[in-house]
């Protein structure tokens, strides 16, 4: 995805000129994973925009276009940009944990992007300890799908529902990335040594 060029993906935004540089909207972007995504993309000449609350590391990336809001019903700046014709090659969603938020974001952005990349988790699997997992393996489910509180027992099933929400809003245009454990500089969990 990083370093790609826009092309005719069959998206509602239509084909773009072959020499048009890629542009990515990062949902989040200033927490743990997001800055690494932003830095890798900008190093490759990709134009980046950020959408977040502006609360975590707001000093980061002063040169990058920013949209402020909250995924919990405060998408106004992003909605205005989409209505004004703003388009991106892709979205990288580093801050999706609640299916309703992912559904709302993906639905809003569907006409404005070619592809949606959702950072999910290996925890989506009903049995993440299984060797040789594939996309065909069963995902965990919540007894009550209206649950939005993140806990050890709900995290994986919520991420699975987020994947489904993005895919429902943008059929055929979603990539779900299911990392096992993300560690590295800036990790607030102290797993990185």
Question: What are the language-model segments listed below?
Answer:
Residues 23-44:
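N-terminal Rossmann NAD(P)H-binding glycine-rich loop of SDR-like oxidoreductase domains
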Residues 61-70, 134:
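Active-site regions of enzymes building and remodeling cell-envelope glycoconjugates
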Residues 1-13:
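N-terminal export signals
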Residues 144-176, 185, 191:
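Active-site Tyr-X1-5-Lys
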Residues 86-142, 160-165:
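NAD(P)-cofactor binding segment of oxidoreductase domains
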Residues 124, 182-184:
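Conserved sequence/active-site signature of Rossmann-fold short-chain dehydrogenase/reductase
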Residues 67-88, 100-101:
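Conserved Rossmann-fold cofactor-binding substructure of NAD(P)-dependent oxidoreductases
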Residues 50-55:
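N-terminal Rossmann-fold cofactor-binding loop
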């Amino acid at each position: 995805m990083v370093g790609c060029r826009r092309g005719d993906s069959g998206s509602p935004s239509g084909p773009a000129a072959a020499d048009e540089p890629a542009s990515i909207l990062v949902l989040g972007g200033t927490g743990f994973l997001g800055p690494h995504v932003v830095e890798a993309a900008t190093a490759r000449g990709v134009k980046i925009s950020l959408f977040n609350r502006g609360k975590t590391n707001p000093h980061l990336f002063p040169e990058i276009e920013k949209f402020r809001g909250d995924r919990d019903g405060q998408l106004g700046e992003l909605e205005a940009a989409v209505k004004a014709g703003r388009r991106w090659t892709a979205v990288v969603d580093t801050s999706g944990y609640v299916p309703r938020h992912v559904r709302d974001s993906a639905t809003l952005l569907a006409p404005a992007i070619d592809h949606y990349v959702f950072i999910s988790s290996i925890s989506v699997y009903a049995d993440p300890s299984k060797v040789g997992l594939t996309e065909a393996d069963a995902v965990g489910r919540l007894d009550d799908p209206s649950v939005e509180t993140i806990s050890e027992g709900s995290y994986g099933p919520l991420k699975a529902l987020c994947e489904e929400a993005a895919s429902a809003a943008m059929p055929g245009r979603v990539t779900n990335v299911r990392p096992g454990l993300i560690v590295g500089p800036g990790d607030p969990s102290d797993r990185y040594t």
